[in-house]
Design a protein with these regions (language model features):
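Extracellular/periplasmic carbohydrate-active domains that bind, remodel
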Residues: 1-430
């Protein structure tokens, strides 16, 4: 049945697509089909239970560039970190499939292009950021995202909040690497999530596990598997944190390739939550330096727990515990790195606020080739966001440890191109 979408790339088809979704869901479910060779410009769309949103080859669903139509915050009362475009809450049996494209129209929401990033447009209200997140999926039970291409997000791209039993398979997520906050996939307070066979390019983190304070009712982030993915990021390709007010536990990340990234693998715990029982295995990565706009100093492996930098009145109730403007950091423990091959301008970094915060970190069969490839100055490790000084200036070590216990290394090999890395300090600083 045709619900009146034009597909001309000019008319806003959100109302027509919404009618199709509502009618399909009301009848118990089915497929909402976007045909080939058409571009469907659309504002916000509310997805429903028992729907397969199917994008045929050559079809494009594109975000309307009119900032004024995005009314729903992606983070509840916190309106300072973007709005929702394609969204849903507390539904079940949702799938997004096909070989068509979901286009976030990201450049339309940017300011001037700089050499390393885009400026953000000046905000009329500093507490309100109108940039739309592409997919904000809240409390979905049984979710599938398969085969689609998602391009040019203006803010976070795929955000799973409190989802259970989710599969993301075979997608290409291709963001502009100059767009700040352009996360790829954020797994937030979610359980039983499998991400596989994906190609992800993003300015911010490609895949990020976290527990945001706004969504604490959904509990811990647990039982996550990432396999067979290829990633490029100007921040961190695979990250846990920095937001973590609960626990992140039982995570397996295996058989991945990371190219032309800033950080490769990162645990960046900055809140009171804990990170335990995580295994990274069979990963090859290439990390190098970018400008200070991006967190990270080319650390191929980064395991940290530090208190977040003190906030202000805007941070109370969402960045820190209710009513507070500062927080504390939780424990990071039982983290294993197996069979990692890295080429990088910097060494690995392991550190905590106190020695008990980071413990039982295992490096098994890790090979690191230190090689200078950019003109950015090295010899710095990046602790941001944290209280106090965010950078540690040091010689470059294969593994630099600051305030941690139980760090074990078995078959760690560090090869240094000494002419290009004259400040090489050795395999470790221990």
């Amino acid at each position: 049945m045709d619900y009146g979408a034009k597909g001309d790339g000019i008319t806003d088809d959100a109302a027509a697509i919404q009618r199709a979704i509502d009618a399909c869901s009301a009848k118990g479910g089915g497929q909402v089909y976007l045909p080939c060779a058409k571009t469907f410009l659309a504002g916000p769309i509310d997805l429903k239970s028992n729907i397969d949103l199917h994008l045929d080859a050559g079809s494009v669903l594109k975000a309307n560039p009119d900032e004024s139509i995005y009314k729903l915050s992606a983070f509840k009362e916190n309106r300072g970190e973007g709005m929702m475009w394609l969204h849903c809450k507390d539904i079940e049996n949702l799938s997004i499939t096909g070989t068509g494209t979901i286009h976030g129209n990201g450049i339309a929401f940017m300011g001037a292009e700089l050499f390393d990033s885009y400026e953000l447009k000046p905000l009329k209200d500093p507490t309100f950021d109108p940039r739309p997140h592409v997919l904000t999926l809240i409390g979905v039970k049984r979710l599938v995202i398969r085969d689609v291409t998602i391009r040019e997000g203006a803010y976070w791209t795929v955000h799973l909040i409190g989802c259970q039993d989710a599969v993301i398979d075979g997608i290409s997520l291709l963001n502009n690497v100059k767009i700040r906050n352009g996360d790829g996939i954020d797994v937030d307070h979610s359980k039983n999530v499998r991400i596989s066979n994906c190609h992800i390019t993003s300015g911010d983190d490609c895949i990020c596990l976290k527990n945001r304070r706004e969504w604490e009712e959904y509990g811990a982030c647990t039982d996550i598997v990432v396999t067979n993915c290829v990633m490029t990021s100007r921040s961190c390709a695979i990250k846990i944190g920095s937001e973590n007010m609960d626990s992140i536990v039982r995570v397996m990340i295996d058989n991945c390739v990371i190219t032309a990234s800033n950080r490769g693998i990162g645990i960046q715990n900055r809140d009171e939550g804990t990170v335990t029982d995580v295994v990274f295995s069979n990963i090859t990565l290439d990390s190098h330096l970018f400008s200070d706009v991006w967190w990270g100093k080319a650390e191929p492996i980064y395991v940290t727990s530090y208190p977040r930098a003190n906030g202000n009145h805007k941070d109370a109730n969402w960045r820190f515990p209710k009513g507070q403007i500062e927080g504390r950091c939780g424990e990071v423990s039982r983290i294993t790195f197996n069979n990692i091959v890295a080429t990088s301008e910097n060494g690995c970094f392991v550190g905590g606020d106190t020695r008990d915060k980071v413990n039982h970190i295992y490096f098994n069969n890790v090979r690191l080739h230190l090689k200078k490839v950019t003109d950015y100055r090295g010899g710095v490790y990046d602790k941001r966001p944290c209280k106090g000084e965010g950078f540690i200036k040091s010689d470059v070590f294969g593994v630099y440890v600051e305030e941690a216990t139980g760090v074990q290394m078995h078959h760690l090999e560090v090869v240094c191109d000494k002419p290009s890395v004259p400040n090489f300090g050795g395999d470790t600083n221990l």
